[in-house]
């Protein structure tokens, strides 16, 4: 079968496009999975993985370091896309929109933290409340449920004119993802960061030493949602639109990426946890891409992701229960 080049990579004839501006994969029976197809799968997975790595990195800060089940993520991701889309449509530079998305994402995370620490609202409920409020805020920002950016200048417009578009876009996402990872490591390793990690592990001990864990929680959630909002702003520009539903299931996808990464890297330190978020994001997107190529319906992706997380979280408990039963039986 002959193939023809495309913007995203190798596109065999009679192929079904995947993920819009990405690579197209063959759907005809008997088509040989050649090196070009493998390269295409790798390219789109790496590009998408690095684009969403900031979501996983933000969830690492809230779930792993702060031990705070923050559900604001689904709303703050859309917030980033909505802010950037609105700013670009109004004629502002894309970089200004990205900066504002970071600021507002940080504010959204801090709001969740303040509801929990000042008003003593349950952590899950605090996240749900802010996420619900953000739904209306995002609609107000965009003015409608979907804002296309195809005909506007974005941060990725200069890459469209280059032959190695995929390479430059991947390097761009990679630089941002690893830059945020190293900044997170620098924040965590000094004394404030050690307090954050201890806050999640033993809050009563830190309070007994006179440390204000409430401030740590608010700051940590702000940083977490700033990362997520930044990711939303970049993804909206990359895919060419911002949509009110683009954040649905984002927290589950981020958790899946973290679980995969921590399993592969056996992450037991903060630096490994942040690296696991990036690696896991790539592997997760690789799994999704391969699943789509094999015929998995796009409508089933959320269900498959949820099942993956349930399996990963439930297996250790089942294993421990089995070992305890064997121990009681004297086996």
Whereabouts are the PLM-identified features?
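Membrane-interfacial amphipathic/re-entrant helices at transmembrane-helix boundaries
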Residues: 23, 27-55, 83, 90-96, ...
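Single transmembrane alpha-helix segments in multi-pass membrane proteins
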Residues: 40-93, 98, 114-119, 259-266
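Alpha-helical transmembrane segments within multi-pass membrane transporters and channels
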Residues: 59, 92-132, 137, 178-179, ...
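Short loop segments and helix-boundary regions at transmembrane helix junctions
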Residues: 64-69, 110-150, 160, 240-244, ...
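Helix-loop-helix "hairpin" substructures at the membrane interface of multi-pass membrane proteins
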Residues: 108, 163-251, 256
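Transmembrane helix-bundle core of multi-pass membrane transporters
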Residues: 123, 127-130, 134-189, 218-219, ...
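Cytosolic-side transmembrane-helix boundaries in multi-pass membrane proteins
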Residues: 183, 201-208, 212-215, 268, ...
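Transmembrane alpha-helical segments in multi-pass inner-membrane proteins
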Residues: 228-303
């Amino acid at each position: 079968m002959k193939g023809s080049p495309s913007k995203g990579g190798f596109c065999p004839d009679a192929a079904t496009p995947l993920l819009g501006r990405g690579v197209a994969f063959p759907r005809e029976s008997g088509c040989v999975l050649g090196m070009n197809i493998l390269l295409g799968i790798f390219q789109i997975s790496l590009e998408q993985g690095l684009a969403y790595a900031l979501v996983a990195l933000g969830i690492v800060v809230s779930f792993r370091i702060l031990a705070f089940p923050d559900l604001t993520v689904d709303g703050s991701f859309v917030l980033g896309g909505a802010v950037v889309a609105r700013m670009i449509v109004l004629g502002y530079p894309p970089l200004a929109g990205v900066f504002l998305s970071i600021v507002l994402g940080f504010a959204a995370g801090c709001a969740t933290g303040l509801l929990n620490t000042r008003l003593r609202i349950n952590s899950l409920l605090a996240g749900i409340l802010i996420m619900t409020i953000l739904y209306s805020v995002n609609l107000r920002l965009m003015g409608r449920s979907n804002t296309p950016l195809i005909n506007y200048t974005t941060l990725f417009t200069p890459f469209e004119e280059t032959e190695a578009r995929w390479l430059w876009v991947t390097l761009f996402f990679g630089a941002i993802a690893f830059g945020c990872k190293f900044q997170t490591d620098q924040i965590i390793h000094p004394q404030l960061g050690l307090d954050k990690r201890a806050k999640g592990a033993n809050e009563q001990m830190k309070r007994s030493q006179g440390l204000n864990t409430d401030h740590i929680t608010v700051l940590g959630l702000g940083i977490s949602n700033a990362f997520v909002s930044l990711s939303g702003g970049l993804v909206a520009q990359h895919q060419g639109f911002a949509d009110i539903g683009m954040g649905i299931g984002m927290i589950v996808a981020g958790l899946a990426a973290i679980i995969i990464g921590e399993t592969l890297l056996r992450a037991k330190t903060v630096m490994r946890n942040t690296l696991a978020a990036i690696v896991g994001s790539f592997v997760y997107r690789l799994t999704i891409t391969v699943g789509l190529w094999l015929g998995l319906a796009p409508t089933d992706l959320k269900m498959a992701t949820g099942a993956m997380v349930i399996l990963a979280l439930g297996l250790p408990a089942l294993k421990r229960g089995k070992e305890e039963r064997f121990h009681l039986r004297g086996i």
